[in-house]
């Protein structure tokens, strides 16, 4: 049996640009892609924290160190510069691998610089007002 699991996320990134007339995708700083184990062309889901929009698209590599999170194409109707978003990727793994799988969580600041790396999908963002859900079980706890 194959299972689809949360593989990685870039949490609370700030959208830096939106280009309605581009052919599609999301442009992501190469350093963020590396930290989140994302490849060019990889499927990601984007969740807009500000307005609740959810969409899926693919990743295009952006300039390393630029902090770019650029929404391209029709998605620019839903997600705008300044919006906070979560970029989420998934992996299909067999049952045995799923039981030992460790995801990657990339926390960024307002300029999309990495402030923390982890593997706990429910961990609060360091230095923010975010909180862990009171119903979440802490791994290993």
Swiss-Prot record:
Cofactor: binding details: Binds 1 pyruvoyl group covalently per subunit.
Subcellular location(s) per record: Cytoplasm
Keyword Cytoplasm: yes
Single GO biological process annotation from the record: alanine biosynthetic process
Coiled-coil regions listed: none
Modified residues (Pyruvic acid (Ser)): 25
Residues given in the record as substrate binding sites: 57, 73-75
Pathway stated in the Swiss-Prot or TrEMBL entry: Cofactor biosynthesis; (R)-pantothenate biosynthesis; beta-alanine from L-aspartate: step 1/1
Cofactors, names only: pyruvate
Recorded superkingdom: Bacteria
Any GO CC annotation of this UniProt entry: cytosol
Active site: 25 (schiff-base intermediate with substrate), 58 (proton donor)
Gene3D superfamilies for this protein: 2.40.40.20
Cross-referenced SUPFAM superfamilies: ADC-like (SSF50692)
A GO molecular function held by the record: aspartate 1-decarboxylase activity
EC number: 4.1.1.11
Keyword tags: Autocatalytic cleavage, Cytoplasm, Decarboxylase, Lyase, Pantothenate biosynthesis, Pyruvate, Schiff base, Zymogen
NCBIfam families recorded: panD
Similarity remark: Belongs to the PanD family.
Oligomer and partners: Heterooctamer of four alpha and four beta subunits.
Protein name per the record: Aspartate 1-decarboxylase
Species in which this protein is naturally found: Streptomyces griseus subsp. griseus (strain JCM 4626 / CBS 651.72 / NBRC 13350 / KCC S-0626 / ISP 5235)
């Amino acid at each position: 049996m194959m299972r689809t699991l949360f593989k990685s996320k870039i949490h609370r990134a700030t959208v830096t640009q939106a280009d309605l007339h581009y052919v599609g995708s999301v442009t992501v700083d190469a350093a963020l892609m590396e930290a989140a184990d994302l490849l060019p062309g990889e499927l990601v889901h984007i969740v807009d924290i500000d307005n609740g929009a959810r969409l899926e698209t693919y990743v295009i590599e952006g300039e390393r160190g630029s902090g770019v999170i650029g929404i391209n194409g029709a998605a620019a109707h839903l997600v705008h510069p300044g919006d906070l978003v979560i970029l989420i990727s998934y992996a299909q793994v067999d049952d045995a691998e799923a039981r030992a799988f460790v995801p990657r969580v990339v926390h960024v600041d307002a300029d999309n610089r990495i402030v923390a790396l982890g593997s706990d999908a429910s961990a609060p963002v360091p230095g923010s007002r975010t909180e862990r859900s009171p119903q979440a079980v802490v791994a290993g706890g």
